[in-house]
Structure formats: structure tokens, C-alpha cells
Amino acid sequence: MLYSQWPERSGSRKDIADGVAVRTKSMARMAQKLAHIRKARGEFVSLLLQRLRGKPFFRQTMVSAADLEQGLTLVLPGIEAAGPFADAMVNGLASAVPGAVQIFYWGIPFPEGYLPNLMWLRRNRAKAAELAQMILRYQDRYPGRPVHIVANSGGAGPAIFAVELLPLDRKIDGLVFLGGAISSTYDLRGALRRLEKGIFNFYSHRDWIVLGVGTSLFGTSDRKPHIACGCVGFKRPTTNADPENLYAKLHQVKWKPALIDDCGHWGTHGFSASERYVRQYVAPWIAKK
């Protein structure tokens, strides 16, 4: 029997083609992931060099009075204090939400910040007081405009502390956590009373190295040796502990593998504030009235 006359195994060519497609897709995914990591690493090195050369470390985008008339979204970086993650959040929001988008720089500059930014509770509460006053001044000048806070990683601490300091008659609209470093058992009732729409918490079980092991060893932003809300989400209290049903305003979104293809979010800590993720999932909630 000639080779061409041999019976072909059913589906063999399709199986090979499917296998090639899967490998090609996997390689493209990995290339995107590595490009993201290289870009972030390069920008952090650039920031460090700027500090060594005595150049400004913090940079702020200019906002117009017309933007401020429409609302204000404040972005809090993580314990790195500034850099590509904060810039990614701003870029993801600026083109997708109404009003001004500004970074609130609360941390000690890179590289000496990091752990002190996570662990120095007194300083973080002082920065939270500054943030609360900034919000009140904005509300005095632009009453009735929407105000939101978006906090990444360790920025979740100063963010929620600031909300808790607001008078009950001076609520803001919403608070967003991206890979937040607050303990998963934190009592949110004080903050939820001061939020119209509530808290939007994005979390990922893949973030267990930083927000599981890391926060268990070094503590969360609220100084608990505990797994963080950015890894497992916030734990809801019993009904008896929440008679006002405030936790109805806690909205939680869990990472899922489909987000890799959807917006390049791999679920680990370095992707918790990615620009595409913020634009597609955070911005619509902020824009919603």
C-alpha cells in the first residue's frame, strides 16, 4: 500500500493545528507579560536615577478648572510611592471618567520607602488627614460634584483612613481598591457610612505572594499580620454585626483567567493596576451615577 493510501487518523491534522494555535497564543501572552514587566522595571530604574541626580521624583498631570467642575478622582499609589503603576491608573482613568484625575502622593520616595510606607501607621494616618482636608476643600469649592478614590496596594491604608475622617454629612461617591493591602477582616462600616456608592474591591488569589505571605510577615496597612483584602476579598460580618446593612455597598470582583486575554491582567501583584484593566473595569463604575 502506498503512503498516500494509508488511512489518516481522524482529527490528527486538526489536533496538530489546534496545538500550534494554543502554543502560539501562549507565546504571545507570555511576550506581553514579559514586556509589561520589562517596562515597569525600566521605569523604576529611571525613577531611581532621577532621585540620585536630584531631579523631581513626583510628577503631577495638569488639570483644568473645566475638568474640576465635572468631578475629581484621586489616585493613591502603592508603597513604591510613585512610578509606572500610578501612571497606569491615571492613564486608564483619564480617558474614561468625567472630571479631573490627580495623584495623591502619600509615600516616602523610592527606594527608601517601601516597608516604611507599609508599616509607619502614624505617618500614614497623618497623610490620610491631609487627603481628607484636600477632599473637603474641593467640596467647598465644587459642591455636589462626584469624588472618588482609587488606591493600589499599600495606598489602600491612607485611602480608607481618609474616608473615615470625613464628616458624615460630607460623603464622597466611591472608594476603589486594586490589590489592596488592608486586612481582609477590616471593619468597613466607618468608611461605608461616608460613601454614596460604596467600596469596589478587586482581588486575586494569584496575589498570594505579596498580599498573602508578604502581609502575613510584614503586616497589612492597618498593621495586622494577616492575609489582605487584595488576595481573598473582605470578609462580611454577620447580620447582627451590621444592622444598618452597610455591607450591601461592598462590591467585590474576583480575578479570573479570562482577564489575561481580555485586558492583560495575570492576577499577580504587578498587574493589579494595569491600564487596560483600570479602563475596562474601574472607570465604568466611577462614571456610573
Regions found by a protein language model. Name each.
Residues R59, A65, D87, F161, ...:
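Residue-level detector of functional hotspots within protein domains
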